[in-house]
Amino acid sequence: LSTDACRAYALCLAEYFADPRTLFVISTDFCHWGDRFRYTRYQAPEDEPVVLSCDTKHHIREYFPIHQSIAAIDGECMAAISFGRQGAALARTQYLESLQRTHNTICGRYPIVLLLTILELLEEAEYAFECRFTHYEQSSACESLDDSSVSYASAYVRSLSQSGLDASRLT
């Protein structure tokens, strides 16, 4: 999804997002880790990231199991998406940078970018929001290359604006 296309979709959807009678639900899994997903990135603290294989499995640190590395990768993306007042533009930029850096296999990467772009447009129209994550889980705690896991996270976006949203203020 190009930046221009994303902004065009965001402009179309922003007025619906501004309507308090509308509920948006953005649903996505987070990291899909394991050989079957073709994603085996591992990074212990202070180490360079590696793609794990039979030849590189010696990089797994006993004090930092694979499932903690997955949580750290997801945590970087969640931290990028989370923001307070007037932060959607920065969140979008940081999220895209995090995806580029980690190659995280988030299925809904583009719906998340679209949501952040909608919020950015609304912030440009003087509205304020926050986005916070409330829960995180993994389908299994990976310990070896034979394991696989899918991560799940829950977040919310809420308006911090004192007045209701007015779609006519959008440009």
Named regions from a protein language model:
Residues 1-22, 33-171:
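Flexible, D/E/H-enriched segments
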Residues 25-28:
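Short beta-strand segments
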